[in-house]
């Protein structure tokens, strides 16, 4: 998305263009990250480490599997005589086998959930008609207004553009950190997955496994909310600014930066709240 920066000869315009290019770079990076799987993220090196940790924790998970199973049998069966009943014994046996399968094939289960979420992201991208994020550029009207000001009038514009550029840079950083944080949550959940999945062995403890699966699904679906936020922002940013004649150049630029930063704040806020939105929709509290 980012091309070579061409200097306009005006420091104020160059500063705004540089800030917008930084913002566009981060949006482009987010667009790429949303279509990247954990296996391919950063060359796959992190994923290989996570897979190794997941395999190592399976030994602990199998021990917990037996513990959860025994505790579950003791709480659900009133006596040993009740356990001798064929239907009760069969039910406990099936639960243990399914819990063991969840621990053994937990990695396949989690990658399947992520693939479903990625399919939803690809569908949203296709339906939106966007192959990439629309770049935010400095409108010609604003550039003309800045170029027409004199030396004295340009002094307040310097302060306005410096403040606006700082806001844009900070918002860009917060936005990309949030998206990277989603990958870290995916990795951490995948690494410790065998332990919470082992809780399916006992009926009283199965709520732990259910909550874990729902939380992991919520992390995967955060990508859909982030993508929708970016698409909505692109529609906001595509509308041209309203330039009122007769206003001072500093006021015109300030109004433009204020509107731009407001739209960016809406996007960053939506991305930051993506986990909360998904949790509320899925009833996770």
Whereabouts are the PLM-identified features?
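Loop-to-transmembrane-helix entry motif
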Residues: 53-60, 96-100, 177-180, 187, ...
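Hydrophobic alpha-helical transmembrane segments
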Residues: 59-71, 168, 186
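Alpha-helical transmembrane segments and their helix-start/interface "positive-inside/aromatic belt" motifs
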Residues: 5-15, 86-106, 209-219, 274
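Alpha-helical transmembrane segments
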Residues: 197-214, 246, 277-281
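Alpha-helical membrane-interface segments at transmembrane helix boundaries
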Residues: 50-58, 90-94, 98, 147, ...
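Hydrophobic transmembrane alpha-helix segments characteristic of membrane transport
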Residues: 64-100, 192-206
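Non-cytosolic segments of integral membrane proteins
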Residues: 99-192, 230-282
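Binding/recognition "hotspot" determinant
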Residues: 1-64
């Amino acid at each position: 998305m980012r091309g070579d920066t061409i200097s306009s000869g005006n420091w104020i315009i160059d500063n705004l263009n540089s800030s917008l290019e930084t913002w566009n770079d981060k949006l482009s990076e987010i667009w790429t990250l949303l279509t990247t799987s954990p296996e391919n993220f950063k060359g796959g090196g992190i994923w290989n480490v996570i897979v190794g940790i997941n395999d190592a924790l399976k030994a602990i998970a199998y021990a917990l599997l037996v513990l959860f199973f025994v505790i579950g049998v003791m709480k659900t069966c009133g006596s040993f005589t009740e356990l001798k009943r064929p239907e009760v014994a069969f039910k406990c046996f099936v639960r243990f086998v399914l819990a063991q399968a969840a621990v053994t094939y937990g990695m396949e289960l989690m990658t399947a959930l992520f693939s479903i979420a990625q399919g939803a992201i690809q569908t949203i991208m296709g339906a939106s008609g966007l192959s990439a994020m629309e770049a935010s550029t400095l409108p010609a009207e604003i550039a003309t207004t800045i170029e027409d000001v004199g030396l004295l009038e340009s002094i307040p514009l310097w302060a306005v553009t410096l403040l606006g550029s700082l806001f844009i840079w900070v918002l860009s950083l917060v936005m990309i950190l949030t998206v990277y944080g989603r990958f870290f949550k995916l990795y951490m959940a995948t690494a410790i997955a065998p332990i919470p999945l082992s809780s399916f062995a006992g009926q009283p403890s199965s709520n732990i496994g259910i909550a874990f699966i729902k939380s992991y699904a919520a992390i995967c679906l955060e990508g859909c909310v982030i993508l929708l936020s970016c698409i909505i922002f692109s529609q906001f940013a595509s509308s041209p600014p309203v330039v009122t004649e007769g206003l001072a150049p500093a006021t015109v630029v300030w109004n433009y930066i204020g509107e731009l930063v407001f739209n960016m704040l809406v996007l960053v806020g939506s991305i930051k709240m993506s986990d909360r939105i998904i949790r509320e929709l899925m009833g996770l509290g």
